[in-house]
């Protein structure tokens, strides 16, 4: 696996070019501001009625409609929600691209699953910071950066990889390290991680643990602390130093209990189900299911959101978080 640093990237591959960042959310604001502060000529492309227009202007960025931004730009970074990209690409992006332009993404969903099929006469690249946008921005302003992934899907001009590296450098990523991958590998591992571990597996494990304690007669408050609240303490240890750091930091009782009981939960049957989930990502079944869900108005997602919203762990959690002065109330 190739890893690149400061000396491997040249901002000259972006200098003198017009750069459009479409979207001004978590990633969009970080990409636009970091590249602007790196000396690039940047505009933000948004719907004319977007509430983000004024935020971008207040940050010193030029704002254009999406179509105008694409027409103006040499390099276009698409940082719009996955489910919106296809329609916007067909209506406002594709008609305004010209040969030699570069189309960039921070996630490969629409390219990998062929929701977007770019013309052959442009570069298509991916630059994916491995952190939320606020951290991309904060580390940059501190003179550092976060690790990034890059990939080249199409190289029409012969400069696609150099442009991807330059973009990563403009974000601050080459100070941490930039890993070269493929659109396929980024997309499939990202979706699997979200579904099996980060957003799906962990949430279901939390709820199952909470329900087990409550059904056994323990107070909801104690169940919340043990199965939800304290998870952050453990995840922070994983984040800082891996499994070994966590095991070193907890009590011997916790370490022994975790190592001997954990495998009874995550059995070969669980891993077999993980493999099925991965297969659904790999063969496109999940993508087709999600696209159909979006086109039908999110009936399943809305139902599942309501089930989660009304789960008792949410109600007791809301009460307990009122006791935590260090939390930012939203």
Curated annotation (Swiss-Prot):
Active site per database record: 107
Residues reported to bind Mg(2+) 2: 190, 226, 230
Cofactor remark from the record: Binds 2 magnesium ions per subunit.
Annotated binding of Mg(2+) 1, by residue: 190, 194
Listed GO CC annotations: cytosol
GO biological process, one term: isoleucine biosynthetic process
Catalytic activity: (2R)-2,3-dihydroxy-3-methylbutanoate + NADP(+) = (2S)-2-acetolactate + NADPH + H(+); (2R,3R)-2,3-dihydroxy-3-methylpentanoate + NADP(+) = (S)-2-ethyl-2-hydroxy-3-oxobutanoate + NADPH + H(+)
Alphabetical list of InterPro entries matching this protein: 6-PGluconate_DH-like_C_sf, KARI, KARI_C, KARI_N, KARI_prok, NAD(P)-bd_dom_sf
Keyword presence, Cell membrane: no
Ranges of residues in domain KARI C-terminal knotted: 182-327
KW NADP (keyword) present: yes
Binding site for substrate: 251
Any one GO molecular-function label of the UniProt entry: magnesium ion binding
Amino acids binding NADP(+): 24-27, 47, 50, 52, 82-85, 133
Enzyme class: oxidoreductase
Function comment: Involved in the biosynthesis of branched-chain amino acids (BCAA). Catalyzes an alkyl-migration followed by a ketol-acid reduction of (S)-2-acetolactate (S2AL) to yield (R)-2,3-dihydroxy-isovalerate. In the isomerase reaction, S2AL is rearranged via a Mg-dependent methyl migration to produce 3-hydroxy-3-methyl-2-ketobutyrate (HMKB). In the reductase reaction, this 2-ketoacid undergoes a metal-dependent reduction by NADPH to yield (R)-2,3-dihydroxy-isovalerate.
HAMAP family with a match to the protein in the record: IlvC (MF_00435)
NCBIfam families referenced in this protein's UniProt entry, alphabetically: ilvC, PRK05479.1, PRK13403.1
Homology family: Belongs to the ketol-acid reductoisomerase family.
Protein name in the entry: Ketol-acid reductoisomerase (NADP(+))
Organism: Chlorobium phaeobacteroides (strain DSM 266 / SMG 266 / 2430)
